Each structure stands twice: as C-alpha cells, then as structure tokens.
Amino acid sequence: MDRIIQSPGKYIQGADVINRLGEYLKPLAERWLVVGDKFVLGFAQSTVEKSFKDAGLVVEIAPFGGECSQNEIDRLRGIAETAQCGAILGIGGGKTLDTAKALAHFMGVPVAIAPTIASTDAPCSALSVIYTDEGEFDRYLLLPNNPNMVIVDTKIVAGAPARLLAAGIGDALATWFEARACSRSGATTMAGGKCTQAALALAELCYNTLLEEGEKAMLAAEQHVVTPALERVIEANTYLSGVGFESGGLAAAHAVHNGLTAIPDAHHYYHGEKVAFGTLTQLVLENAPVEEIETVAALSHAVGLPITLAQLDIKEDVPAKMRIVAEAACAEGETIHNMPGGATPDQVYAALLVADQYGQRFLQEWE
C-alpha cells in the first residue's frame, strides 16, 4: 500500500487577513461567487467587497441558505453560472464551507475557504457532508482535491464564542491518538493510502501545541483578543488537525462520537465536545498509561471539555445507553476498525464506562 499525504494548496492565517482576500485570490480567478453565512456577511460583506474591488476582481455575493443540501448547491450554482463566476469563496461555519467546496467541485472551478470559527478541522479537507433540506444526514461527498486556498482571519475567529474554540481543541485532541493507532495498525486513511511520516509529525505537533498553548488560547478567546497562543491553537485546530486526520487516519475517538449520536442525550453538544470523550475512551481501549489518560483529561477539563458522561447530559439508564453507543461505534465501515486488533462492542462498552470512571475520579481529585 502506498503512503499518501494531501493538504490545501495554500494555508494563510493572520489578524485582519480578510482585508487582503482579493490579493491572495487574484491568481485563481477574476470573477468570484462568495457564499457566506448571513451572520458573517452582516459584519464582513463590505470589507470583502472592498478587498475584491481593490484587487480588480468581480464579486457576486450569495447568502447561504442554511443547509448543505443538494438543492442549495444547485440553487447557488444557478447564481454562479448566471454571473459567470470562475471560482467560489466560502466564508463562515462548517456547512457554508462544505457547500462552497461541493459547489466548486460540481462546477469544476477553484475554491477558497475562509472559516470564521475554529471549532473543527474540516476546512482543509477534501470532504463535504451533504444533508437533506430538513437537516438529516444524506451522504459524504468525497472530493478529488483539497481546497485551493484556506484563509483564516484570527481576529474574526477570536470574536466567536470561546466554547467553539474549545470544541475545536476537542476535535484536534483526537488527531494524534487516532493517527498513532492507524500508524500502528497500518490502516488506510481518508487520503487513500497509509500515513506518511509528515502526517504523523503534524498530528504529534498538533497534540503538543494544544498541551502547551490550549489553556492560554482559551483565556484569549474568552476576551475575544488575538495572542500568540490563540494563533498557534487556531493553526493546530484548523491545519495541523485537518491534514493530520485526513492523512494520518481516524480511529476509535471519532467512532465513539458517531456512537454518541445514536442516543438523544448528547445531541446538543458540539462535535468536538463528543470527540473529546471519545479520545478518553480510545485511550482506555488501548490500555494507555494512566499518566497519558490523566494528561488528556486535565487539558480537556482546563478548556471546558466534558470528561464524564454526566457532563454530556447522559445521566440515566447509563449502561443501556452505552450498549447502544458501543454497537453504533462498531458498525460496519466505522473508523474504530482502524484500531490495532480492531474492537468489539463489548470492549467499547467497557472502555466507555471506565473512561467515565476516570473522569469522575479526576474531577473529585481536582475540585
């Protein structure tokens, strides 16, 4: 099996970089469709338009309808084709960005992505998650290429609720442990091959960055200011984790997240908040040293991520619910089968309950 790493063509990050969008995007195309969150366009549209105009580019702005569905993609395609746009810029949150990526793919044109939050590692990936108009999961759209450009304005990210940054840390915290597991098992990653040394190194750097800078970055996020620590964590959440998960591989942590979606209790928690508990579960499954489990739990707790089931509002009928979660996490095609030696529902059930016990014990010690 060949080793493969893939990543966006260019990654650009800085405070007020939105003012320089036009000059960065100019080499890709002259006429652009900008698909933006209505909320983001509310404060950024004039800046975006000025940036394009100053660079001599033609821009058409289309507010995102709210759901990354095939109908929404087709609607936006009509606007883009009428305006003869030769490239797409997505600006906003995850569904907006996934829509922009899918739209550009169907049109066969370049795409640039400008995330305004750092809550997941999705912006850099060659993947869009497609939903129905009602918001039900429809399918994964695997794209042939990563975005041509990912541009992150750290000042805009700093303006978002701090909990979103914490969720991004939760998502990124899994990257090293899942890549490490895939490296040990020789699993095939989403890039279509085995992981490279480079992908593993980025995944490990991601983890070390979160350990060193995570708590400091959260203090900045709570004050909505940009500091060197916040800059580093935004890069870890977005780029290091993005390349790390796609080319390093996913394992138990994300499968446990998917299992948790099979029960209603934790539905209102963010992706990364559920992944954080999934990471603790994976470490128990691997029989990791207790020091490693405690280090991960301590970082999670410090930035406000859940380390017990109760913190995910799973408080009643816990054993029965964990059976459901464990079965769903071990479904055919789930990433848990990338673990060395695989995993059975019984093993995952045990790991879920023990991870919860660890979390409860740490909370008693720390509080």
Curated annotation (Swiss-Prot):
Return the protein name.
Glycerol dehydrogenase
Cofactor needs = Zn(2+)
Q: Which GO terms describe its biological process?
A: anaerobic glycerol catabolic process; methylglyoxal catabolic process; protein homotetramerization
Q: What are the GO cellular component annotations?
A: cytosol; protein-containing complex
Tell me any Pfam family this protein matches: Fe-ADH
Its pathway, per UniProt, is: Polyol metabolism; glycerol fermentation; glycerone phosphate from glycerol (oxidative route): step 1/2
**What upregulates this protein?**
Full expression of gldA is achieved by induction with hydroxyacetone and stationary-phase growth conditions.
Q: Is-annotated flag, keyword Zinc?
A: yes
Main function: Catalyzes the NAD-dependent oxidation of glycerol to dihydroxyacetone (glycerone). Allows microorganisms to utilize glycerol as a source of carbon under anaerobic conditions. In E.coli, an important role of GldA is also likely to regulate the intracellular level of dihydroxyacetone by catalyzing the reverse reaction, i.e. the conversion of dihydroxyacetone into glycerol.
Which residues hold Zn(2+)? D171, H254, H271
Query: What further fact does the record state?
Result: This enzyme was independently isolated as a glycerol dehydrogenase from mutant E.coli 424 and a D-1-amino-2-propanol oxidoreductase from wild-type E.coli. It was shown later that GldA is responsible for both activities.
Q: Which domain of life does the protein's organism represent?
A: Bacteria
The UniProt catalytic activity note for this protein reads: glycerol + NAD(+) = dihydroxyacetone + NADH + H(+); hydroxyacetone + NADH + H(+) = (S)-propane-1,2-diol + NAD(+); (R)-1-aminopropan-2-ol + NAD(+) = aminoacetone + NADH + H(+)
Natural source organism: Escherichia coli (strain K12)
The entry's family comment says: Belongs to the iron-containing alcohol dehydrogenase family.
One GO molecular function term of this record is:
zinc ion binding
Q: Does the keyword Mitochondrion apply?
A: no
User: What is the gene name?
Assistant: gldA
Where on this chain does glycerol bind? D121, H254
Q: Which PROSITE patterns match?
A: ADH_IRON_1, ADH_IRON_2
Q: Which residues form a coiled coil?
A: none
Enzyme Commission number(s) of this protein:
1.1.1.6, 1.1.1.75
Q: Could you describe the subunit structure of this protein?
A: Homodimer and homooctamer. Forms homotetramers in a solution containing 5% glycerol.
What activates or inhibits this protein?
A: Glycerol dehydrogenation is highly activated by NH(4+), K(+) or Rb(+), but strongly inhibited by Cu(2+), Ca(2+), the thiol reagent N-ethylmalemide, and the chelating agents 8-hydroxyquinoline and 1,10-phenanthroline. 1-amino-2-propanol oxidation by the homooctameric form is strongly inhibited by numerous divalent transition metal ions, p-mercuribenzoate and dithiodipyridine.
Under the heading CDD domains, the entry gives: GlyDH
